[in-house]
Amino acid sequence: MAVIEVKHPLIEHKITNIRDVNTDTKSFKENLAEISSLILYEATKQLELQEVEVETPLTKTKAYRLSDSSLAVVPILRAGLGMVDGVMSLIPNARIGHIGVYRDEETLEPKHYYCKLPEDIAKRSVFLVDPMLATGGSAIYAIDYLKSQGVPKVTFLCILAAPEGIKAVTTAHPDVDIFIAKIDERLTEHGYIFPGLGDAGDRVFGTK
């Protein structure tokens, strides 16, 4: 298990853009997707390659390809949808599933409302994506469910994380690697990441 805060000037710049309350919906979505690509770049360092032979304009040569058939991307709805385009731009042949979980604003407990996964999900390593890791409840629920379906490896990608959420996920699932664009200070008394960026789902879809 590893918790990796991905350090890069481009990430810092784009995190500033999505934190800014004056950033419009279009720019927010674009920056979110770009940060997602940068995180995935780091998270895919350990992917296995298959040796192949290709023909260049000059000769045949040994080369390597990713085994995309072994990968799946699963966003936690709805905010996780904002990360999908950025992730899929790098691994376009991966399959996509969806898990719908929302947080009860009074109890802060996760509530499940939807799930659709590839039929062969038990043969795939999954990148689970959600912009915000706050209390960790939604992530833990989603990881629990993926493991119950036989998924051999789950890697969690998020944009912002609170220390409390990181601790909760690593305690519940010590085998899951977590890649984070930025670790924030703390949770507020209402369970929001501070200083945060607001409600990621609302900002992705322009609903507030």
UniProtKB/Swiss-Prot annotation:
Gene3D superfamilies in UniProt: 3.40.50.2020
- Cofactor detail note: Binds 1 Mg(2+) ion per subunit. The magnesium is bound as Mg-PRPP.
Q: By its UniProt entry, which InterPro entries does this protein fall under?
A: PRibTrfase_dom, PRTase-like, Upp_B, UPRTase/APRTase, Ura_phspho_trans
Where are the annotated coiled coils located? none
According to UniProt, the name of this protein is Uracil phosphoribosyltransferase
Q: Could you tell me which pathway this protein works in? A: Pyrimidine metabolism; UMP biosynthesis via salvage pathway; UMP from uracil: step 1/1
Keywords recorded for this protein, A-Z? Allosteric enzyme, Glycosyltransferase, GTP-binding, Magnesium, Nucleotide-binding, Transferase
Functionally, this protein is described as follows: Catalyzes the conversion of uracil and 5-phospho-alpha-D-ribose 1-diphosphate (PRPP) to UMP and diphosphate.
UniProt GO molecular function: GTP binding; magnesium ion binding; uracil phosphoribosyltransferase activity
Q: What is the lineage of its organism?
A: Bacteria, Pseudomonadati, Campylobacterota, Epsilonproteobacteria, Campylobacterales
Which reaction does this enzyme catalyse, per its entry?
Answer: UMP + diphosphate = 5-phospho-alpha-D-ribose 1-diphosphate + uracil
What EC designation does it have? Answer: 2.4.2.9
The cofactor required is: Mg(2+)
Q: Which family does it belong to?
A: Belongs to the UPRTase family.
The UniProt gene name for this protein comes to upp
GO biological process per UniProt: UMP salvage; uracil salvage
Positions annotated to bind uracil: I193, G198, D199, A200
